[in-house]
């Protein structure tokens, strides 16, 4: 079994204190994410970024539900500085570039599936932001693509606690697992 770690959207705009769409405690995932990324169990570590054009349909100014965030080539779209990118991230994959699609799932880009297949990856651990949006969408798409999926519960945070719990339950119901290192439990 070959396993990859996907770090979903650990970006400045999703983290307090100044993120345009800050996930509560989103900055607190840095340590568990870096610990995971340093683990020898992963054949590949990929970080994704929301990398929106300025006219993205998800922005409230254009009739969408989200404030403007992660606009490409801005400070907000950069990976969070606490992510040990140089030492631990093998590839950065941008998503959400089409202004007419939400871009929640890392699997919107066919390159991801192709790369994982080429490397013989059959299991994914997913960490990052936000549990109830992009982590959820990526996990469900990965399960549908046939990957074994584990969510690193300690290394994710969501926009809404109730929505995050619903997302984790949906992932479990579809065959994924949720692991909590701090509590030494898996569900």
Task: Identify the residue ranges that each predicted region occupies.
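Internal catalytic-core helix/loop-beta-alpha segment
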Residues: 78-129
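Histidine-anchored nucleotide/phosphate-binding helix
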Residues: 36, 136-144
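Glycine-rich anion-binding loop/nest that anchors nucleotide
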Residues: 122-134, 151-156
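Short, small-residue-enriched loops and turns at beta-alpha junctions
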Residues: 100-103, 156-160
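Active-site acidic carboxylates
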Residues: 1-96, 148-150, 159-160, 165-187
């Amino acid at each position: 079994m070959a396993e990859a770690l996907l770090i979903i959207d650990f970006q400045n705009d999703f983290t307090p204190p100044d993120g345009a769409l800050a996930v509560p405690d989103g900055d607190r995932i840095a340590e568990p994410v870096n610990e995971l990324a340093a683990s020898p169990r992963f054949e590949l570590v990929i970080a994704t970024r929301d990398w929106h054009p300025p006219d993205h349909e998800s922005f409230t100014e254009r009739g969408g539900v989200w404030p403007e965030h992660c606009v490409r080539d801005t400070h907000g779209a950069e990976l969070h500085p606490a992510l040990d990118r140089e030492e631990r991230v093998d590839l950065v994959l941008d998503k959400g570039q089409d202004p007419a699609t939400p871009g929640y799932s890392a699997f919107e880009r066919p390159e991801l599936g192709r790369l994982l297949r080429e490397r013989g990856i059959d299991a994914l651990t997913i960490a990052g932001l936000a549990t109830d949006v992009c982590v959820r969408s990526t996990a469900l798409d990965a399960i549908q693509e046939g990957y074994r999926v584990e969510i690193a519960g300690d290394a994710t945070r969501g926009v809404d606690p109730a929505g995050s719990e619903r997302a984790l339950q949906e992932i479990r119901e579809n065959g994924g697992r949720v692991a909590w290192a701090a509590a030494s439990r898996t569900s």
